[in-house]
């Protein structure tokens, strides 16, 4: 795992196994560094080589966990005044190494699926298109070392502007 970002929290999840199989508790509100409760849960399925990102929100936090498969995850702190402003962090999120990942608002996120990947995620707000922003996954100002130069992208992610342009459009996050 790369350097940590202010407010980002990685939770090592405990696996309980016996002859029947296994059990993992993926989420407890008390694990998160926020009083805002989770309001919406989602599941995203990606084929190998899919890159989703970079995306960010001004108001919403995310809590991610791998349901199956694995992905390379990249985060970038866009928060003005944050002690880790413009810093990045990378890590692997995998079902066979269960971890939860808390991503505060103002921290951009993206992932590249290494395999068939199912991501479960919770948010503290209901979906609101006015709080969905994105920028180019390979923006050179961040220097993220993605494991591929030719990912499978959605039309939306392929058309994303530079980070600088995205931040001009989105009212910047302030701590």
Where are the language model's segments positioned?
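Short beta-strand His + acidic residue motifs that chelate non-heme Fe in jelly-roll/DSBH
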Residues: 101, 109-114
């Amino acid at each position: 795992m790369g350097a940590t970002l202010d407010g980002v929290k990685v939770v090592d999840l405990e696996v309980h196994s016996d002859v029947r199989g296994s059990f993992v508790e993926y989420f407890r509100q008390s694990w998160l560094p926020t009083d805002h409760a989770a309001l919406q849960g989602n599941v995203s399925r990606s084929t190998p080589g899919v890159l989703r990102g970079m995306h960010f929100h001004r108001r919403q936090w995310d809590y991610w966990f791998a349901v199956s498969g694995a992905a390379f995850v990249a985060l970038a702190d866009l928060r003005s005044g944050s002690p880790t402003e413009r810093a990045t962090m990378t890590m692997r999120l995998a079902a066979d190494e269960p971890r939860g990942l808390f991503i505060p608002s103002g921290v951009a996120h993206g992932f590249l699926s290494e395999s068939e990947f199912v991501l479960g995620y919770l948010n503290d707000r209901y979906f609101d298109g006015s709080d969905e922003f994105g920028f180019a996954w390979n923006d050179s100002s961040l220097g993220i070392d993605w494991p591929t130069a030719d990912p499978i992208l959605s039309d939306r992610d392929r058309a994303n502007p530079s980070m600088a342009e995205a931040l001009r459009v989105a009212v910047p996050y302030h701590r």
